[in-house]
């Protein structure tokens, strides 16, 4: 398509299906859930054209809500296999980067259509079974958000390529957005299928090749994502999938001289480790690696005395307990004025009592299980501490049971000390801690909200008075990269609320935005002169 100036289809957010009783999508999804539950998938490493299974290094993928149930078996990559995957990336990069950008874009637009069609129940079922998401949480993540990433990233890439410098008479200036020279290392979390697939595909769209390391606990849905990309026409080697011991994979990737970037979502501690290692290895790299990370959060809801109780309670419940609080944006701490607390407390307890926890294939459940035993133990540790502490009291929940699945009841803690650990530390589970502040000391409460935690990912305020809304927004300016007014702090939509935070929450490069894509290209400025100068002398030199 050398003789065409194309325009990509206008992006649109994928409509969310309801899965209400009697709908066609519910019937299809139930059938697919049964099919996948009865099948143990074999998930290989994907290295170029090779699908590699190593029976000596096999590991199981289990269902969090039924951990005796093996969903899949995967091969853990050796150091040699990681090296081979990187070499395959480097070999594929030149041809991939040389394609017209429209040809690269077409792969991801095709992938979006596949997800909207036949792969919708497949990737949703894999996300429900493998990550214990309800049908709604799987739909808004694995299908809708991932489709949105593909469509909007293409739109933003078109804007990048279209942005060109001015040209003076007698010359033509151009700007070329080249893919990074080398390979990008994509390190993925368990909690969002869409993020796990966007981390490698956003750089790939811009002409990069990518070493993709999904989390083993979300590997079933990541494998579906890989199959979608292959069917959409992604050439072998552009994205290679490796999984296994993170230390083995990262040690090879971070020591490689062709490391061009890291696209990361996960814990602050792991990202800090990656950053430090890159710093220690800086002299061996051919270029300065781009480091893009979305990390931890201790996300807040701050209520003013003018807030409406009903919407505040709903925001707290949904913000804290959807997907078991395992969203990096989940409401984990709240500051409630004393004047509202009796009504808010009553509403929280009454609403939490209605929440059903269990197998997400039972569509009446609001919550599933937390992801694994390690997460269960960590969250339970915070709950046990609150049960014994003089600085906190549990006002709802606190029950934990890992006998069948890793189930934790939604838990609400009232902190008597605003510096109590569950008001400051990331828990990543269905635990909401509330501090009740004196209405007359709202400025002190705002300072606590801003300074108590090192994170600054998401936050929300609830108030009716417009002057107060402006005041709170200013006071909490740097407390959150995504800030919500009279809404829960979760549920960012691609193309509407670009997502990311600062401080210890990451580099704030906003996934699903033009700013993120700019990190995966290196611009070359080209100046062509139509009237070359033939005399080295300047006019001022004339006698």
Predicted regions and their residues:
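Short linear capping/connector segments at secondary-structure termini
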Residues: 126-133, 165-169, 362-368
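Rossmann-like NAD(P) dinucleotide-binding subdomain of oxidoreductase/dehydrogenase enzymes
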Residues: 128, 147, 157-311, 504, ...
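Conserved residues at the C-terminal ends of beta-strands
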Residues: 156, 187, 245, 265, ...
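Hydrophobic face of amphipathic alpha-helices that form TPR/SEL1-like repeat modules
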Residues: 1-71
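Conserved C-terminal structural/oligomerization subdomain of aldehyde/semialdehyde dehydrogenase
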Residues: 1-7, 11-18, 65-77, 81, ...
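Long amphipathic alpha-helix in the N-terminal Rossmann-like dinucleotide-binding domain
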Residues: 79-90, 94-95, 105-121, 132-161
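ALDH superfamily catalytic-core signature
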Residues: 228-233, 255-256, 261, 269-418, ...
């Amino acid at each position: 398509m050398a003789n065409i100036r194309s325009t990509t289809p206008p992006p649109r957010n994928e409509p969310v299906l309801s899965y209400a009783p009697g709908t066609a999508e519910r019937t299809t999804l139930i059938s697919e859930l049964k099919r996948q539950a009865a099948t143990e998938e074999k998930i290989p490493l994907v290295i170029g054209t090779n699908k590699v299974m190593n029976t000596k290094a096999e590991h199981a993928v289990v269902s969090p809500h039924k951990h005796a149930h093996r969903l899949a078996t995967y091969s853990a990559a050796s150091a040699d296999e990681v090296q081979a995957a990187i070499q395959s990336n480097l070999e594929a990069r030149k041809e991939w980067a040389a394609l017209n950008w429209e040809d690269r874009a077409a792969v991801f637009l095709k992938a979006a259509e596949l997800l909207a069609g036949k792969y919708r129940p497949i990737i949703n079922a894999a996300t429900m079974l493998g990550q214990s998401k309800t049908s709604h949480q799987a739909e808004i993540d694995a299908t809708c958000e991932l489709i949105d990433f593909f469509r909007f990233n293409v739109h933003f890439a078109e804007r990048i390529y279209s942005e060109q410098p001015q040209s003076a008479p007698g010359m033509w200036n151009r700007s070329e957005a080249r893919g990074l020279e080398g390979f990008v290392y994509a390190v993925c979390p368990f909690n969002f299928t869409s993020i796990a697939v966007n981390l490698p595909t956003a750089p790939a769209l811009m002409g990069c090749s990518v070493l993709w390391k999904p989390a083993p606990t979300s590997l079933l849905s990541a494998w579906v994502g890989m199959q979608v990309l292959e069917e959409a026409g992604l050439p072998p080697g552009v994205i290679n999938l490796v999984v296994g011991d993170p230390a083995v994979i990262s040690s090879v990737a971070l020591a490689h001289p062709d490391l061009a970037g890291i696209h990361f979502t996960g814990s602050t501690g792991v990202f800090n480790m990656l950053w430090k290692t890159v710093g220690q290895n800086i002299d061996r790299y051919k270029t300065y690696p781009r480091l893009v990370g979305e990390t931890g959060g201790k996300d807040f809801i701050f209520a003013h005395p003018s807030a409406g109780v009903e919407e505040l309670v709903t925001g707290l419940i949904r913000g804290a307990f959807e997907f078991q609080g395992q969203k990096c944006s989940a409401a984990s701490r709240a500051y409630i004025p004393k004047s509202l607390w009796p009504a808010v407390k009553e509403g929280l307890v009454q609403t939490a009592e209605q929440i059903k926890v269990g197998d997400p294939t039972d569509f009446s459940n609001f919550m599933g299980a937390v992801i694994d035993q390690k997460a269960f133990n960590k969250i339970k540790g915070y709950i046990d501490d609150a049960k014994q502490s003089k600085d906190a009291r549990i006002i709802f929940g606190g029950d934990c049971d890992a006998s069948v699945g890793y189930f934790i009841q939604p838990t609400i803690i009232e902190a008597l000390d605003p510096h109590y650990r569950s008001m400051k530390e990331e828990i990543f589970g269905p635990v909401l801690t509330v501090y009740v502040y004196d209405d007359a000391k709202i400025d002190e409460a705002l300072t606590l909200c801003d300074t108590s935690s090192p994170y600054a990912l998401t936050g929300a305020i609830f108030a009716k008075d417009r002057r107060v809304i402006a005041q709170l927004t200013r006071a909490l300016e740097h407390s959150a990269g995504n800030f919500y007014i009279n809404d829960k702090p979760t549920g960012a939509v691609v193309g509407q609320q670009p997502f990311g935070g600062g401080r210890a929450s990451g580099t704030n490069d906003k996934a699903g935005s033009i700013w993120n894509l700019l990190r995966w290209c290196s611009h070359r400025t080209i100046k062509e002169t139509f009237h070359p100068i033939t005399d080295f002398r300047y006019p001022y030199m004339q006698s």
